[in-house]
């Protein structure tokens, strides 16, 4: 038993100190005897332990638990492929594309009229789109 205690001290607590603190290493305590305390005094100490649990109210029929839902997010692809369907940006599209910022700047409709005009206005369309 002594060998086991020494091994325990060496592994867990480390090696014994050279001097001084060796006696503080192991603390032995005696359990308190309640009967000894009660005998010396005129009143007896009585201890009770009790455990109570509240009654659970169960529903009449079992129900399937519902999963919490997250709020619906806007579909990004819907707003990309159908620009007019996004209610938050519906007015922005008409303001940007239908009303040019400069009197001589081409609109979107000027860029796609026909093949001949498209070739003439390619540079203007690119510059106009780049500025916006």
From Swiss-Prot:
Organism: Arabidopsis thaliana (Mouse-ear cress)
InterPro entries in the cross-refs: DRM/ARP
Domain of life (superkingdom): Eukaryota
Residue ranges, compositional bias (Low complexity): 61-70
Note: Predicted to be an intrinsically disordered protein.
UniProt keyword list: Developmental protein, Phosphoprotein
PANTHER family per record: DORMANCY-ASSOCIATED PROTEIN 1
Protein name from the UniProt record: Dormancy-associated protein 1
Consequences of knocking out this gene: No visible phenotype. Drm1 and drmh1 double mutants have no visible phenotype.
